[in-house]
């Protein structure tokens, strides 16, 4: 892969992760965009012990958000649904908070 293709792919990831970050923030979560490689570090400010890192990958059917353990979250076409799923995972993982 050439430098231009790699740069374009990183720009695409950053763009989609930025859209997801905005959706997460409207749901009361904190999302920090990391650039190398592009990922989102997501935390619930009420339970800082619980966090998740999400990245963005190109698959045969398009671009998708992906949990750190490799499961696909949702298509990048639907960042709102992805944010809902991520919030559900974070909130239900918290030892001190009800969903």
Q: Where are the regions that the model predicts?
A:
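Negatively charged, low-complexity tracts enriched in Asp/Glu with abundant Ser/Thr
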Residues: 1-42, 72-73
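Short, intrinsically disordered, low-complexity terminal/loop segments
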Residues: 2-3, 97-99
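Glycine-rich loop at the start of a catalytic domain that most often binds anionic cofactors/ligands
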Residues: 43-48
């Amino acid at each position: 892969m050439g430098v231009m293709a790699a740069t374009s792919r990183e720009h695409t990831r950053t763009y989609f992760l930025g859209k997801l970050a905005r959706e997460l923030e409207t749901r009361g979560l904190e999302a920090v965009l990391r650039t190398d490689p592009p990922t989102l570090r997501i935390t619930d400010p009420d339970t800082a012990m619980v966090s998740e890192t999400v990245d963005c990958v190109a698959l045969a059917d398009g671009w998708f958000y992906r949990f750190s353990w490799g499961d696909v979250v949702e298509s990048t076409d639907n960042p709102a649904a992805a944010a809902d799923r991520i919030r559900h995972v974070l909130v239900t993982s918290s030892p001190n908070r009800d969903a």
